[in-house]
Regions:
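Hydrophobic faces of well-ordered beta-strands that scaffold small-molecule active sites
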Residues: 5-7, 48-52, 83-85, 109-111, ...
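Short cysteine clusters
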Residues: 14-21, 257, 272, 343
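Canonical radical SAM enzyme core domain
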Residues: 26-39, 57-106, 113-119, 126-131, ...
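Radical SAM enzyme [4Fe-4S]-AdoMet core and its adjacent flexible, acidic
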Residues: 30-31, 114, 126-131, 138-256, ...
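Flexible mid-to-C-terminal extensions adjoining Fe-S/redox cofactors in radical SAM and related proteins
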Residues: 268-348
Length: 348
């Protein structure tokens, strides 16, 4: 029996098709409360502490989001606070949504920008997204919830970061949050290079781009991450990582005693270690049942887990890395990229 299991069922999908999303862009489903109850019942015998969520892409996307929130609470042994991720799509279409979040005790809500209107709409994959984000910022402040802006940075949008500085200044976000006792936040980063974000590899930032990040955004970012330099936020160049890891003989088990499982609309199950994709698939909950899925997970039988447990780091890196690249990665994100590439190369 595992100490804790968290089950996340992608019941309704997502309104966006974001070009940065590590979870990937897959078709939306329309699963029911009975489906959520089924998923919870399957994993219930295998843990002393079960936590259930009705989403893993867009929170509160379904019209009955409040009922689903209550159902998740009844199916779970723990009740966490609402995530700081909120649905912009819902916020501008449901007059009761922000007030509901406020009553749940939400203090901070994170929103994602990529630059100005055209660029943000492009990366979000939906026209009108930028204007909806700005409207949501106003709604949050009206309800005394502090917005926190996350900015993904690539070569392609680095020159638009000043538009975000102008937005923060024009909307007077720091002072307006301070007025009700809140704190405005903002940070920039490149994210992990998996899912849709792996497609941005050719536009990945290098040390040359870091000098183009405006001082205001640098200051906010260092405060958010508790770091002293942007190098600590964006990581090392691939060339350095390659040099070090290409002689690394270690392997790694990716098994946890408190796993989180993502279940898609077809009831295929994946660990939340990377993009839900074939190399991470543990089985199908309806056809295989939770016991077989847990056996697959605990014994590292998914392709990606098996490779990471049995293949030295150096083999992954030498096979898939670029020894001359100046792209910036955190070590674990880089290893995840190497592992996903290696797995795909094996089956193609």
């Amino acid at each position: 029996m595992l100490d804790k299991i968290t089950v996340c069922l992608d019941m309704h999908g997502c309104p966006n098709r974001c070009r940065h999303c590590w979870l990937g862009n897959t078709p939306n489903g329309r699963l029911t409360a009975s489906d959520l109850e089924f998923a919870a019942a399957c994993f219930r015998p295998h843990t002393a502490c079960l936590t259930v969520y009705d989403w893993y892409r867009e929170p509160d996307y379904s019209d009955d989001y409040r009922e689903r929130w209550e159902l998740c609470g009844r199916l779970s042994d723990t009740r966490d606070e609402h995530f700081e991720l909120v649905s912009v799509w819902r916020a501008v279409r449901d007059d009761n949504y922000i007030d509901w979040l406020k009553r749940l005790g939400l203090k901070v809500a994170q929103l994602t920008l990529f630059g100005g209107r055209e660029t943000t709409d492009y990366y979000t994959g939906r026209r009108g997204a930028y204007d909806e984000i700005l409207r949501t910022i106003e709604l949050l402040i009206e309800s005394r919830i502090s917005p926190r802006i996350q900015v993904f940075v690539y070569k392609d949008n680095i020159n638009e970061l000043n538009s975000i500085v102008e937005l923060i200044t024009t909307l007077n976000l720091v002072e307006r949050c301070r007025d009700f006792g809140g704190e405005f936040g903002c940070f920039v980063h490149q994210g992990s290079c998996d899912g849709e974000n792996e497609r941005q590899y050719n536009s990945w930032v290098t040390p040359a781009e870091l000098s183009l990040i405006p001082p205001m955004l640098t200051e906010f970012t260092l405060k958010h991450f508790g770091k002293s330099s942007l190098d600590e936020v964006f990581g090392e160049i691939e060339q350095s990582l390659y040099e070090r890891l290409s002689v690394d003989d270690t392997t790694e088990s990716l098994v946890s005693c408190e796993p989180v499982f993502y279940i898609d609309r077809e009831f295929d199950v994946y660990p939340n270690l990377s993009t839900p994709s074939p190399q991470w698939r543990l089985g199908n909950l309806k056809r295989d049942g939770a016991e077989k899925i847990l056996d697959c997970y605990l014994n590292s039988r998914s392709l990606a887990q098996h490779i990471r447990l049995n293949t030295p780091t150096r083999e992954l890196v030498v096979s898939q890395g670029d020894p001359t690249s100046q792209r910036l990665f955190m070590r674990e994100d880089y290893l995840e990229l190497m592992l996903n590439r290696y797995c795909r190369a094996l089956v193609n």
